[in-house]
């Protein structure tokens, strides 16, 4: 299990690197679009659409790695206010709810992407793309998030009985 967790960590780091590169490319594209419009060269027509799709992909690429590192949005003031054992149980409850939600998104995302693929649906904006290209990353990202919730539960089971210390607390 430790080897799988280590391999998975490398995968998530690679995905976060890809998200950073995509963010850089999007920033350069937006800057170039503004520059071209200001000098009268007409801009980059699909820049808005590419920016929208990039933000979506950046989110899906970065989310599993951020969850693993404890850098996701987390309000843990209640966990710090209750007894250690109850905080630990609430951590479990949060992880179970997160796992179930992610698995539902995997199922739903895969269903929608498959339906789009078999129907031949097309997204027509500035660019014309098969719709499933935009939908396919969602179930993959949520499957990785579900796997991370599994690893989180494994780490929680073997840790001291108390809330995690992997987040910045308001207390």
Predicted feature locations:
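Alpha-helical transmembrane segments and membrane-interface helix-loop junctions
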Residues: 1-171
């Amino acid at each position: 299990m430790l080897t799988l967790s280590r391999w998975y960590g490398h995968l998530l780091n690679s995905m976060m690197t890809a998200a950073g590169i995509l963010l850089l490319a999007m920033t350069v594209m937006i800057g170039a679009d503004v520059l071209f419009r200001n000098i009268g060269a007409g801009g980059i027509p699909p820049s808005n659409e590419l920016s929208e799709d990039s933000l979506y992909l950046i989110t899906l690429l970065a989310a599993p790695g951020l969850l693993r590192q404890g850098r996701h949005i987390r309000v843990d003031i209640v966990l710090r206010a209750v007894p250690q054992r109850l905080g630990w149980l609430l951590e479990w409850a949060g992880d179970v709810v997160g796992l179930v939600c992610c698995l539902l998104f995997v199922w739903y995302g895969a269903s929608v992407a498959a339906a789009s693929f078999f129907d031949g649906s097309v997204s027509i904006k500035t660019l014309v793309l098969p719709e499933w290209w935009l939908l396919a990353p969602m179930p993959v990202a949520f499957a990785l998030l579900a796997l991370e919730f599994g690893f989180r539960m494994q780490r929680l089971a073997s840790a001291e009985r108390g809330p995690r210390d992997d987040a910045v607390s308001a207390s």
